[in-house]
Amino acid sequence: MGGNNDGVSGAACLKPLNGVSPTYVPSAGAGALYFLIGSGLGVVAVLHASGLAEVSGEWASAARWTEVSREWPSAARWAAQLAGSVGAQRLLLATSLLFLAVSVWRLARRCAAVEGRVGSTDSAVRALHVGGVVCAVCGSKIRALKRGCRGVERTRSVDSSKPVSRSLAAEFDQEADGEEEDNAGETSDPDDGSVQYLRRRLKEEMLLKEVALEELEKERHAAASAADEAMSKIACLRSEKALVEREARQFQEMMQQKQMYDRQVIESLQWVIMKSGMQGWEPEAITDRALSETSEDDRDKK
């Protein structure tokens, strides 16, 4: 992977695409050799033109020249010939231009090979996935961005609880898991495979945790709504109870008032009856007394 290769050379970070020959990629040894040759030629040319006797004597000594000729015999001879025939500035400029031309030529071949393999924008996007990334550092950045996007999608899905965002996040996770499985299958290091396995397990556990949190949130909302409904029903029952109690008190007061009124009416009727009875008894006694007197008079006359 790109994130695990810290401390390697710049050429080792470049990964060939599928189908691209590794010969198109300049190796680290070739680049170092070109750089050393160019540096040596430049130093020799500067020493030859400056006329410094001591330094040129040291570089021209037999022992030093023998050591250099053991490493690069052809390069040393070629540098000596060029130093004798061409000026110092021209030699340095020509060496730099030659090295730059070789680098540009190799880079052009590399770009042409990549363009031939990629072809279109969609294929370029597919080529920049983790399995076929050109640069390991770029691949690590792309994976970090994808993980950040997945984290944002997960937070949005938890906050909004929308099925569309959850499905998109699940598709991202499935795609990333498939790519990491392919990369784990291609690698030969068992430690990388165990790391990838642990990462997959961690992602699965995180997804299960998110699902459990969503279910718990739903249950909490349902319990809160049920509690609110129960409290509203209790409040309604309390208000109805208070209304019934108030009506009962009103009816009780009305019954007491009616009972008192009926008692007064009964007492008044009893008084009227008693008064009317006394007045009716006195005329009857007078008539009886008159009849008895008339009957006695009639008897005396006879």
UniProtKB/Swiss-Prot annotation:
Membrane topology label: Multi-pass membrane protein
Domain GTD-binding: 193-299
Biased composition regions of type Acidic residues, renumbered to the chain: 172-192
Example GO molecular function: myosin XI tail binding
Residue ranges of the region described as Disordered: 160-195, 283-302
GO CC, one annotated term: endoplasmic reticulum membrane
Entry annotated with the keyword Nucleus: no
Transmembrane segments: 27-47, 82-102
Assembly and interaction partners: Interacts (via C-terminus) with both 22 kDa and 19 kDa alpha-zeins. Interacts (via C-terminus) with OP10 (via N-terminus).
PANTHER family the record matches: BNAANNG28530D PROTEIN, PROTEIN FLOURY 1-LIKE
Name the record gives this protein: Protein FLOURY 1
UniProt gene name: FL1
